[in-house]
Amino acid sequence: QMHGGIISALLDSAMTHCLFHRNVEGVTAELTVKYLKPVPQEADLRLSAWVEQKILTLYKLKAELSVGGEVLVKAESKFMEIRKQS
């Protein structure tokens, strides 16, 4: 089984890249991970992440890790946007 800390890091990274895709730089302010079933080490993983809500500089995101179409882990997070200084 895959270690929970690695799974958490993968989901956090997927959500971060979801923001990068929108040209938003942000930092994780809060992360909640729900482990529904064990994740096999040798499995082909599918990570999905999306923005649920944006309030000023706060982004709420969700992500899922699935194997063979079955969701094994879910995550929710809040990211704070980093404003670039000119």
Segments the model singles out, each with a brief description of its role:
Residues Q1-C18:
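Hot-dog-fold acyl-thioester-processing enzymes
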Residues G4-G5, G26, G68-G69:
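Residue-identity detector for glycine
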Residues V39-Q41, E52-S86:
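HotDog/MaoC-like acyl-thioester-processing domains
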Residues Q1, T28-K34, R46, K60, ...:
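Conserved beta-strand segments that form the floor/walls of ligand-binding pockets within enzyme
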Residues S13-R46, V51:
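Hydrophobic beta-strand-centered segment that forms part of the acyl-chain substrate-binding groove
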Residues G4-G5, A9, E30, E42, ...:
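Surface-exposed loop/turn and secondary-structure junction residues enriched for glycine/proline
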